């Protein structure tokens, strides 16, 4: 879907889903949406009205010296904070404020969104069993060369910050590879 280092976002996920959905429906087939984070799935299933938001370097510079607590307070002035990932780092909090500022100046245009009568199937798994499965999968990925994969990606020019963006596995392996863990 995207090259390593590219920060694929929920807007693009929704757009790509809609394009694929229409293509599959035109062929007379049943589309199946499988996987993704809760927010990404909800963006499709609930028809979130989204639009691409460009970076605002001037705003980022103004916010750069604020603490996470200050940024969280600023963000709470825009909206009710229901998504804690918006404020788990300074970088994410600044991006969330940047998005809210953009939406305030550029209302989201009405967009046709297909009505989806989705059948939602989820796995309700015991917490300990889930942890065991995650641990097993992580050990398997390590045995299959994930540390070398991270080294190769860095050698190919992917920045450590970009790798850390991809989640916990890459975060801690990247910190290990660059000697910060």
Task: Name each model-derived stretch.
Residues 1-181:
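Phosphate/pyrophosphate-binding catalytic cores of soluble transferases and nucleic-acid-acting enzymes
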């Amino acid at each position: 879907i995207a090259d390593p280092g590219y920060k694929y976002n929920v807007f693009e996920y929704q757009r790509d889903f809609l394009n694929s959905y229409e293509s599959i429906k035109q062929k007379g087939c049943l589309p199946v949406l499988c996987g993704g984070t809760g927010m990404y799935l909800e963006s499709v299933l609930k028809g979130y009205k989204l639009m691409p938001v460009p970076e605002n370097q001037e705003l980022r510079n103004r916010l750069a010296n604020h603490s996470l607590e200050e940024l969280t307070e600023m963000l709470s002035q825009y909206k009710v904070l229901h998504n804690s990932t918006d404020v788990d780092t300074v970088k994410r909090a600044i991006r969330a404020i940047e998005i809210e500022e953009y939406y305030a100046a550029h209302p989201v245009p009405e967009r046709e969104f297909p009505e989806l009568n989705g059948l939602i199937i989820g796995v309700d798994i015991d917490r300990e069993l889930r942890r065991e499965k995650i641990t097993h999968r992580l050990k398997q990925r390590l045995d299959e060369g994930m540390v070398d994969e991270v080294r190769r990606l860095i050698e190919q020019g992917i920045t450590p910050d970009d790798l850390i963006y991809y989640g916990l596995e890459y975060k801690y392996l990247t910190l290990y590879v660059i000697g910060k863990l």
